[in-house]
Swiss-Prot record:
Residues in TNFR-Cys repeats: 47-83, 84-127, 128-166
Record topology, Cytoplasmic segments: 193-331
Assembly and interaction partners: Binds DAXX. Interacts with HIPK3. Part of a complex containing HIPK3 and FADD. Binds RIPK1 and FAIM2. Interacts with BABAM2 and FEM1B. Interacts with FADD. Interacts directly (via DED domain) with NOL3 (via CARD domain); inhibits death-inducing signaling complex (DISC) assembly by inhibiting the increase in FAS-FADD binding induced by FAS activation. Interacts with CALM. In the absence of stimulation, interacts with BIRC2, DDX3X and GSK3B. The interaction with BIRC2 and DDX3X is further enhanced upon receptor stimulation and accompanied by DDX3X and BIRC2 cleavage.
Lineage: Eukaryota, Metazoa, Chordata, Craniata, Vertebrata
Protein name: Tumor necrosis factor receptor superfamily member 6
Reported modifications of this chain: Palmitoylated. Palmitoylation by ZDHHC7 prevents the lysosomal degradation of FAS regulating its expression at the plasma membrane.
Organism: Cercocebus atys
Record-listed Phosphoserine modification sites: 221
Annotated Death domain residues: 226-310
UniProt xrefs under PANTHER family: TUMOR NECROSIS FACTOR RECEPTOR SUPERFAMILY MEMBER 6
Covalent S-S links between cysteines: 59-73, 63-82, 85-101, 104-119, 107-127, 129-143, 146-157, 149-165
Record function comment: Receptor for TNFSF6/FASLG. The adapter molecule FADD recruits caspase-8 to the activated receptor. The resulting death-inducing signaling complex (DISC) performs caspase-8 proteolytic activation which initiates the subsequent cascade of caspases (aspartate-specific cysteine proteases) mediating apoptosis. FAS-mediated apoptosis may have a role in the induction of peripheral tolerance, in the antigen-stimulated suicide of mature T-cells, or both.
Keywords attached to this entry: Apoptosis, Calmodulin-binding, Cell membrane, Disulfide bond, Glycoprotein, Lipoprotein, Membrane, Palmitate, Phosphoprotein, Receptor, Repeat, Signal, Transmembrane, Transmembrane helix
SMART domains to which the protein is assigned, alphabetical: DEATH, TNFR
Membrane topology (UniProt): Single-pass type I membrane protein
C-alpha cells in the first residue's frame, strides 16, 4: 500500500506533462493555420491593389506602358482593351488603368532648353541645356546663360554650374572707374538722342512709318495669326504671356485650367494661352492688338520681328497672286 502512494505522484506528473504537450501542439497548430490564413488574405489584398481597378467593372490587369485603355471592362476580372499612345506626342511610362496618355514635354528653346532624348510611347521627352547655358536646380524648367569672364576663367561653365571668373585687381578697377567716368557723359547723350528719335518715329503713325499701300494695310488687319503662335510664344516668358492674355479677355479660370493641364510644360502653357486668346478675339484686328500688347510689355524687338515676318508673307502672297493674274491674261 505504501508503494502505491509512492508511485502516485510520479504518475500524476507524467499525466500533467503529457496534457501540456497536447495543449501546446494544438496551440501551435492553431497559430500555424492563423498565419497561413493571414498570408492568403494578404496575397488577395495585394492582388486586388496591384491588379484590379474599379471603374465600371473590375479589370484584371492594367494597360502596359505605351498604351491606354480604350474602353471599360464589361465583365469582372476581364482583360482590358488597350490601344497604343500616339508616337512622338503621348506616352505612359508604367502600367495604368487610365483612358488617356500623358502629353510629351516640349523643350522650350526660349528658356535655353533643347531635346536630349525624343519622346516615345513609353518615355517622356528628356531636355537638356543648350550650349553655353546651365541649370543648377533638380527640375529644370529653364536654363540660364553662362557668364562670360573678362579677366580669365577659374572653372568652365557646365550643364549644372555657371562659369567661375577671376577677379580684377584693384589697380585695374581704378583704371576702369576712371574710363567709366569719362565715358558716362557721351553715353548718356547718345541714349537720350536715340530715345528722342524713337519717340518721334512712334508718333509719326502707321501711314508715315510704312510704305505699304492701303490694300496691304487692310489685309494686315485680317491676317491669320495661327501659324505664328509658336514663334510668338517662343519669344515671351510665361508671365508675359499670362499678363497679355489676362488683359485681353482670357478668364482666370481658363488660365488656371491650361496651367493644370500642362504643369510640367511651360512652353505648351504659353502656346495654349495664346491660342485661346486668338480663338476668343477672332481674326479681325488680332494682329494690331498683338503688336500693341507686345510693345506695351516692352517687347518691341519681338513685335517688330513678327510685324516684319507677316509683311513679308503678305508681300510674297501678293506678288504670287499678281504673277498668276498676268499669266492668265497672257493666255
Amino acid at each position: 500500500m505504501l508503494g502505491i502512494w509512492t508511485l502516485l505522484p510520479l504518475v500524476l506528473t507524467s499525466v500533467v506533462r503529457l496534457l501540456s504537450k497536447c495543449v501546446n501542439a494544438q496551440v501551435t497548430d492553431i497559430n500555424s493555420k492563423g498565419f497561413e490564413l493571414r498570408k492568403i488574405v494578404t496575397t488577395i489584398e495585394t492582388r486586388n491593389l496591384e491588379g484590379l481597378h474599379h471603374e465600371g467593372q473590375f479589370c484584371r490587369n492594367p494597360c502596359p506602358p505605351g498604351e491606354r485603355k480604350a474602353r471599360d471592362c464589361t465583365v469582372n476580372e476581364d482583360e482590358p482593351d488597350c490601344v497604343p499612345c500616339q508616337e512622338g506626342k503621348e506616352y505612359t511610362d508604367k502600367g495604368h488603368f487610365s483612358s488617356k496618355c500623358r502629353r510629351c514635354r516640349l523643350c522650350d528653346e526660349g528658356h535655353g532648353l533643347e531635346v536630349e532624348i525624343n519622346c516615345t510611347r513609353t518615355q517622356n521627352t528628356k531636355c537638356r541645356c543648350k550650349p553655353n547655358f546651365f541649370c543648377n536646380s533638380a527640375v529644370c524648367e529653364h536654363c540660364d546663360p553662362c557668364t562670360k569672364c573678362k579677366h580669365g576663367i577659374i572653372e568652365e561653365c557646365t550643364l549644372t554650374s555657371n562659369t567661375k571668373c577671376k577677379e580684377e585687381d584693384s589697380r585695374s578697377d581704378l583704371l576702369w572707374l576712371c574710363l567709366l567716368l569719362l565715358l558716362i557723359p557721351p553715353i548718356v547723350y547718345v541714349v537720350i538722342k536715340k530715345a528722342c528719335r524713337k519717340h518721334r518715329k512712334e508718333n509719326q503713325g502707321p501711314h508715315e512709318s510704312t510704305t505699304l499701300n492701303p490694300e496691304t494695310a487692310i489685309n494686315l488687319s485680317d491676317v491669320d495669326l495661327s501659324k505664328y503662335i509658336t514663334t510668338i510664344a517662343g519669344g515671351m516668358t510665361l508671365s508675359q504671356v499670362r499678363d497679355f492674355v489676362r488683359k485681353n479677355g482670357v478668364s482666370e479660370a481658363k488660365i488656371d485650367e491650361i496651367k493644370n493641364d500642362n504643369v510640367q510644360d511651360t512652353a505648351e502653357q504659353k502656346v495654349q494661352l495664346l491660342r485661346n486668346w486668338y480663338q476668343l478675339h477672332e481674326k479681325k484686328d488680332a494682329c494690331d492688338t498683338l503688336i500693341k500688347g507686345l510693345k506695351t510689355a516692352g517687347l518691341c524687338t519681338l513685335a517688330e520681328k513678327i510685324h516684319a515676318v507677316i509683311l513679308k508673307d503678305i508681300t510674297s502672297d501678293t506678288e504670287n497672286s499678281n504673277f498668276g493674274n498676268e499669266v492668265q491674261n497672257l493666255v
